[in-house]
């Protein structure tokens, strides 16, 4: 079946390190596969039902729609055939994924909220270890990464409520980019980290008039330098979509730096 053969080449790729591939038309291969599978099923009813449903489950799985993936795997598991045993194993794995996703996250207390996120990270890390070397390891890493990024966002939003919140946010970003250096989102995180330093620099300018005597140019320059280093790291890498964005941020930062210097003279 050509409809299955085309996307199976990508079904086991590392979705943590690499984005899902595009087909010749530029469409996500997993989304395209779902459309083609539906079309094939309409035109050829009751043919290769187990293969169609197993392939559909795999595509949903790659797209992290675990409910739809489970529904399709269960259809295959209800049939006698060579894909039944594998479907049963996949059902067990995805049910474990669902159990983690369904863990309650209390929102009333920020410290309880952070503890709940930490618990989820630990749960995903256990699944990463359990499924090491399989495609489920990659999915578990993606889910773990998602929670890690949410933790940083929460700290950043609430930094004014925390003692030394700016330093804590910098530490959180540092941990994120260190832990997920192999992620496809790594350069996105580096840019976000740079953006935070720019935000700190702008906050410093807003709180301390550059034309006044209280303004310390060295403090501003250190923040700008930290941002520039992060932006430059991204801008120096060829073949990534974030490169042009990083170059634009460097130019904007230079403009800000020049403006503040003129005011501070």
Regions found by a protein language model. Name each.
Residues 1-265:
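Acidic, polar-rich low-complexity tracts and alpha-helical solenoid repeat scaffolds
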């Amino acid at each position: 079946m050509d409809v299955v053969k085309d996307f199976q080449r990508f079904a086991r790729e590392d979705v943590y390190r690499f984005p899902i591939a595009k087909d010749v038309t530029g469409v996500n291969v997993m989304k395209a596969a779902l459309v083609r599978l539906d079309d094939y099923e309409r035109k050829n009813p009751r043919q290769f039902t187990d293969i169609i449903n197993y392939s559909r489950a795999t595509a949903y799985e790659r797209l992290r729609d675990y409910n739809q993936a489970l529904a399709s795997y269960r259809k295959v598991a209800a049939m006698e055939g060579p894909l039944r045993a594998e479907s049963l194993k996949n059902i067990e794995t995805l049910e474990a994924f669902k159990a983690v996703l369904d863990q309650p996250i209390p929102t009333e207390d920020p410290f309880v909220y952070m503890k709940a996120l930490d618990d989820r990270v630990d749960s995903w890390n256990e699944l990463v270890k359990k499924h090491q070397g399989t495609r489920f390891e990659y999915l578990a890493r993606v889910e773990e990464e998602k929670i890690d990024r949410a933790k940083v966002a929460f700290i950043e939003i609430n930094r004014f409520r925390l003692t030394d919140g700016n330093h804590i946010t910098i530490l959180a970003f540092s941990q994120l980019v260190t832990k997920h250096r192999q992620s496809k989102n790594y350069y996105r995180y580096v840019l976000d980290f740079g953006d935070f330093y720019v935000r700190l620099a702008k906050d410093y300018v807003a709180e301390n008039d550059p034309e006044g005597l209280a303004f310390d140019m060295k403090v501003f320059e250190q923040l700008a330098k930290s941002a520039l280093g992060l932006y430059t790291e991204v801008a120096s890498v060829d073949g990534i979509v974030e490169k042009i964005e990083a170059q634009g941020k460097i130019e904007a930062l230079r403009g800000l730096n020049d403006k503040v210097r003129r005011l501070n003279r």
